[in-house]
A protein has these predicted regions:
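Basic/aromatic-rich interaction segments and small domains that mediate binding to polyanionic partners
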Residues: 2-57
Length: 59
């Protein structure tokens, strides 16, 4: 996985995002709530380990 890849959180298949930073963890800034409903206050910035993410589209 690299910056710009589209990923999905394995434990919650409805939650997906774009990798914005490449470090030990992947930084997800948007999820399905923000993209579909437009409520940025609900879309928290979260950190995930690589093993918790499924790669949907690689750049």
């Amino acid at each position: 996985m690299k910056v710009g890849s589209l990923v999905r959180y394995i434990r919650d298949p409805d939650m997906f995002g774009v990798i914005k930073e490449r470090e030990k963890f992947q930084f997800i800034t948007r999820n399905y709530i923000l993209w579909n409903d437009g409520y940025p206050r609900i879309a928290a910035r979260l950190w995930f380990d690589d093993c918790e993410l499924e790669l949907l589209s690689d750049v």
